[in-house]
């Protein structure tokens, strides 16, 4: 028996009782940073605002920040930003978001680039955007034939998410402009 055999396996019911910010990966709790850096939060807010402004006329989609996405009874993720469409009004997200944005920090980079990348791909999230605040750039991935296809690195360009219900877009120059020195 390995050490993992002795770790407790937690469920969504357990997760709901915990204080602080957590995610649940296949029954194992992952503590999230208690308070991200101001730059991280400001860029996340700017990304959410840009997405939200571009879908304002669409009544079927919403942009949310740090909302629980319950994938199963033992897996709950809390992406930085999601674009959801036709989601029932519930206490958590129940189906794959159209777009997920994760703003990288030193403590989450490996999880965001590996575990979450693979999970979002497997769960058929149409677009995954990984934002690098220190570099003021974002990588955009589009689901194609059940695999993520990198659309490019964006810093001063715009990207149209053509396969979303609300035809969302992000002007990365507008998002990053105020953070440039």
Segments and roles (model prediction):
Residues 1-181:
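Gly/Pro/Ser/Thr-rich low-complexity, intrinsically disordered segments predominantly at protein N-termini
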């Amino acid at each position: 028996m390995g050490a993992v055999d002795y770790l407790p396996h937690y469920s969504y019911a357990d997760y709901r009782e915990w204080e602080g910010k957590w995610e649940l990966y296949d029954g194992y709790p992952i503590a999230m940073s208690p308070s991200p850096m101001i730059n991280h939060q400001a860029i996340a807010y700017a990304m959410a605002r840009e997405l939200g402004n571009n879908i304002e006329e669409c009544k079927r989609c919403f942009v949310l920040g740090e909302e629980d996405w319950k994938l199963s009874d033992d897996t709950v993720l809390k992406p930085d930003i999601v674009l959801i469409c036709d989601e029932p009004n519930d206490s958590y997200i129940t189906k794959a978001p159209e777009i997920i944005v994760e703003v990288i920090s030193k403590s989450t980079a490996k999880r965001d680039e590996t575990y979450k990348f693979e999970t979002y791909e497997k769960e058929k999230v149409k677009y995954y955007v990984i934002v690098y605040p220190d570099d003021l750039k974002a990588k955009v991935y589009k689901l194609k034939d059940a695999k993520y296809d990198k659309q490019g690195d964006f810093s001063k360009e715009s990207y149209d998410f053509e396969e979303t219900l609300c035809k969302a877009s992000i002007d990365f120059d507008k998002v990053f402009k105020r953070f440039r020195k």
